[in-house]
């Protein structure tokens, strides 16, 4: 079944895990008409629970959104003999009918549709409440839904739109903005400027509604701090440097809730607090992580890097870290041993290589024979330090001293000792780019970074892959410049052809 943007009814099935569709023209037997759905406090709570459940999808943070932006670029190499998982992205053969391109688009708009449904109904439910406690809870839910909708639109903008340039954004294509659930809306793309402004509008509502008292590390729910963290990220993408600094600082200064966890302090059994974040999905610096449990989880982030459960004897990685990435980690950088381990593979060529073990899997899940499943952590405090450092360097009056302090603070928590760094006009973009790789490796930032930096980074030369040991010959010598139209994913073909669609395609659709 092909998915589209518009949904005309609310399906209550599998915890409300539904998507939008443009090819269904009648109500299924399992559906509840819109005017009969979400009538009570309990209904509202169930709807929000369903939205969070949808966010576990392997098309999103537990899979495609996290992995493809880094696999597509220069951070990994496909191994000779690999399973061809994500092969079209590795080869830059990205088509409008590509299943990953369709899945990400459908999953994000599916969540947006459910958010719109909730927002359409919630005022009527709040008006019927007589207990202040329930009103407060519903208002909190509403803030969470605004934050979720903003997050989903921000992801669509990352994948399916050009990088934001304030000078041209008004004339560039954004995304189709769906504000309502029942009210008909044209299937037409807004400008890039208006699309980003809509995200900011939702974030401002979330920031106003969400009570900071509910902030807390390891939260499976949207919080006030998460809204500010997303605001900082979006502002960075928009080149609104002061705004990015303001919101990143808002998060960083909440040090009673969040702190950078040290890789140089033991937590237990030889494992550091930083190791604990990846081995047990517990960290004081995680602002929001998808709400996985051993009985309810999404994709397995570590699968393509290990594939140990093929025969439970050898590793069969589809992708291994690029040598140049491994070389970025200098002596004393404890992230190296937290992220990588040299292991033998089961391939005939016998490759032995530092494999990515960052996503080896939560130890509690492994004890239940669930392999390579790590809870996605889309918002960590570390990213806020990186955002603020870059914004401090790129604002009208750069503050390289302040930026150096931010990077040094992050690195001092990741190194056995030392870690300080000094930024200047000459080296800041290379240093920040490298630190973003070291810290955020395989967390889904590289594609957007290359796109938004453009000529600032490596003169716009982008990257060139150079074959490494046992790498797949096809794709290992690709060169991609920063202005390559394929940095923007194509709009799914079925959206262009859907009845009533006025959606304009991207250059990469050609």
Regions found by a protein language model. Give the residues of each.
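Bacterial Sec-dependent N-terminal signal peptides
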Residues: 1-33
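TPR-repeat structural position
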Residues: 196, 241, 398-400
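Extended ligand-binding clefts on enzyme/binding-domain cores
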Residues: 194, 238-239, 245-249, 253-369, ...
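Conserved, well-structured interaction surfaces
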Residues: 84-160, 190, 208-211, 369-376, ...
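Short, surface-exposed recognition loops and adjoining beta-strand edges that mediate ligand/DNA contacts
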Residues: 34, 38, 62-80, 124, ...
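Membrane-proximal, proline-rich intrinsically disordered regions
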Residues: 22-72, 309, 316, 325, ...
């Amino acid at each position: 079944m092909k998915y589209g943007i518009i949904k005309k009814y609310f399906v209550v099935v599998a915890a409300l895990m539904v998507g939008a569709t443009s090819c269904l023209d009648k109500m299924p037997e399992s559906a509840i008409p819109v005017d009969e759905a979400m009538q009570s406090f309990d209904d509202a709570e169930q709807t929000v629970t369903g939205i969070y459940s949808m966010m576990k999808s392997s098309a999103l943070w537990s899979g495609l959104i996290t992995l493809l932006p880094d696999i597509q670029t220069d951070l990994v190499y496909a191994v000779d003999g690999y399973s061809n998982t994500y092969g079209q992205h590795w080869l830059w053969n990205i088509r409008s009918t590509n299943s990953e391109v369709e899945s990400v688009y459908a999953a994000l708009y599916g969540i947006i549709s459910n958010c719109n449904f909730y927002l359409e109904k919630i005022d009527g439910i709040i008006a019927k409440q007589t207990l202040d406690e329930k009103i407060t809870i519903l208002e909190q839910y509403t803030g969470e839904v605004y934050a979720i909708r903003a997050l989903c639109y921000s992801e669509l903008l990352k994948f399916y739109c050009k990088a934001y340039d304030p000078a041209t954004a008004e004339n560039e294509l954004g995304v189709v903005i769906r504000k309502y659930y029942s009210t008909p809306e044209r299937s037409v793309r807004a400008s890039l400027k208006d699309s980003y402004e809509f995200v900011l509008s939702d974030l401002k509502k979330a920031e106003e509604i969400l009570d900071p008292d509910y902030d807390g590390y390891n939260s499976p729910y949207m919080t006030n701090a998460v809204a500010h963290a997303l605001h900082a990220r979006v502002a960075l993408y928009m080149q609104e440097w002061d705004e990015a600094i303001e919101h990143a600082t808002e998060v960083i200064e909440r040090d009673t809730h969040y702190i950078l966890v040290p890789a140089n302090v033991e937590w237990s059994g030889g494992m550091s607090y930083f190791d604990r974040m990846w081995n047990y999905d517990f960290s004081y610096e995680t602002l929001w992580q998808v709400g996985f449990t051993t009985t309810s989880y999404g994709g397995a982030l570590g699968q393509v890097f290990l594939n140990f459960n093929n025969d439970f004897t050898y590793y069969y990685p589809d992708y291994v870290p690029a040598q140049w990435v491994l070389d970025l980690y200098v002596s004393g950088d404890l992230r190296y041993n937290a992220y990588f381990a040299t292991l033998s593979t089961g391939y005939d060529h016998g490759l032995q290589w530092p494999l990515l073990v960052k996503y080896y899997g939560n130890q509690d899940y492994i004890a239940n024979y669930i392999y390579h499943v790590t809870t996605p952590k889309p918002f960590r405090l570390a990213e806020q330090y990186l955002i603020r450092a870059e914004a401090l360097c790129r604002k009208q009056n750069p503050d390289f001293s302040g930026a150096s302090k931010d990077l040094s603070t992050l690195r001092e928590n990741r190194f056995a000792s030392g870690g300080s760094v000094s930024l200047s006009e000459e080296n800041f973009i290379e240093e920040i780019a490298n630190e973003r790789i070291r810290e955020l490796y395989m967390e889904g930032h590289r594609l957007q970074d290359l796109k938004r930096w453009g000529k600032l980074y490596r003169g716009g030369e982008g990257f060139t892959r150079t074959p490494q040991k046992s790498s797949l010959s096809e794709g290992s010598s690709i060169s991609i410049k920063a202005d390559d139209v394929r940095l923007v994913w194509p709009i799914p073909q079925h959206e262009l052809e859907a009845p009533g669609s006025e959606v304009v395609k991207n250059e990469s659709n050609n």
